[in-house]
Amino acid sequence: MAKCEFKSLPDAKLQRQRNTSFSFSYDEINISETLSNYAKGKTYYIHTYGCQANYRDEEIISGILAKAGFLKASDENADIIILNTCAVRENAEDKVFGKIGELKAIKAKNKNAIIAICGCMVQQIHIINKILDIYKHVDLIFGTHNITDLPKLLDEIILKRNKIVDVKSQPSLIEENLPSTRLSSFKAFVNISYGCDKFCTYCIVPYTRGKERSRKMEDILNECRELKEAGYQEVTLLGQNVNAYGKDFKDGTTFAKLLEEVAKLNIPRIRFLTSHPWDFKEEMIDVIAKYDNIMKYIHLPVQSGSSEILKLMGRRYTSDQYKQLVTLIRSKIKDVYLSTDIIVGFPNETEEQFQETLEMVKFAQYDSAFTFIYSPRNNTPAAKMTDNVTREEKSSRFKRLVAELEKSVSASSMAMVGKTFKVLVEGASEKDNSMLSGYTEGNKLVHFKGDLSLVGKIVDVKIIASHTYSLIGELING
């Protein structure tokens, strides 16, 4: 059995602390002769779970491996297999454990294959212990704060054939000039910040992603300029809380100022994810309204319509404050589309508090929504709360919430019928490969007949029919 070397392990106490000693690095990734020789003729495969930030991490990991000389494989029959994981909910973790188990057969066929687990899940010590105890075929575990150590870690595995665990509790660098293999040739994710300082009581992200750290504005703008010059049609600015961007600079830098500078680059489409209502200022609303190339789509997670539950969640706003923000957004941004996240079954949520959430849904008239039953996360304050809400009641409330949401989502889709919208074509429809699919500026999915040569282009599509979560259209002047 291979020896396991523990380089660093996550510490929940350290993860709660806000380390402010990080710095900026512009050093390029170095690839050793050992790794480049090993990579010749070998392949890699990455399976990513979770949010857009994880997919951006995949692009960087892929870029590092490509720089070393590895070729990208289309399936798990590869020489390096990496699972890039998500820890937001238990269901996501269960999927990862299932996949790790499946990889045992791959390892049996190719004993020299290197199986690695990275991402948010392994920022938790109990997850690392479970992997080491049960899944003996895993060779490498590394965290969210040391992706760029991957070449050195692979060097050691190749030379020593050891297992390695290297998961740091806190970040120390914001690294620029990283290699990247983009997942799309026309849509791009651009990190503007990392981490979160909000510490909502149910959320694991501040522990797995660390303190809020903003990239320098000029570095972000340079990346966006390069994407514009390369012909990208859409750029999404990413952060766990984008509208807290710049708070760590102490020089008056704000997300609104960054967003305006990005808009001036004339990239056809600009989006951003994700916003926290507490930091959503009127200055930001005005910038969105001002520029046509900033999509009139805002993801504004409410989580609950009850002020009492919001307080228990540590969300920092009341139900009335959220409603005032929605009213302000709709008054200033014409034809804005709103989406949200909602959690039902938070510990001790009463029926009356749940009814307040249903009332919020009726008030906000969301165009789309992501709904979840509360999932306890290890070491978070909410996980330690007593909970008298039964599983059956949580499930019932979830179904009732979805039914209420579908009313506004369906109404939003039906209101688009007969109108023409600009759609960025993403590819063949997953439901019917004889059709194309793409998204409107308001992030509505549209299926329509058209030639594959239109992929990556923005076209005019008239909506002729609606379903709750998608639309049917016909190409104009196609």
Describe the predicted segments one by one.
Residues 183-186, 196-198, 294, 304, ...:
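Short flexible coil/turn linkers enriched for glycine and charged/polar residues
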Residues 148, 198, 243, 307-308, ...:
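Glycine-centered loop/turn positions within well-structured domains
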Residues 112-117, 124-126, 229-351:
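Conserved SAM/AdoMet-binding glycine-rich loop
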Residues 2-245, 283, 320-331, 355, ...:
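Proteins enriched for Cys/Gly/acidic motifs involved in redox and nucleic-acid/cofactor modification
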Residues 293-296, 308-424, 436, 457:
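A structural motif corresponding to the C-terminal lobe/cap of the Radical SAM core domain
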Residues 200, 220, 237, 272, ...:
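Conserved, mostly hydrophobic/aromatic
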Residues 118, 369, 448-449:
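Thr-Gly-centered strand-to-loop micro-motif
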Residues 2, 7-14, 384-478:
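Terminal RNA-binding accessory module
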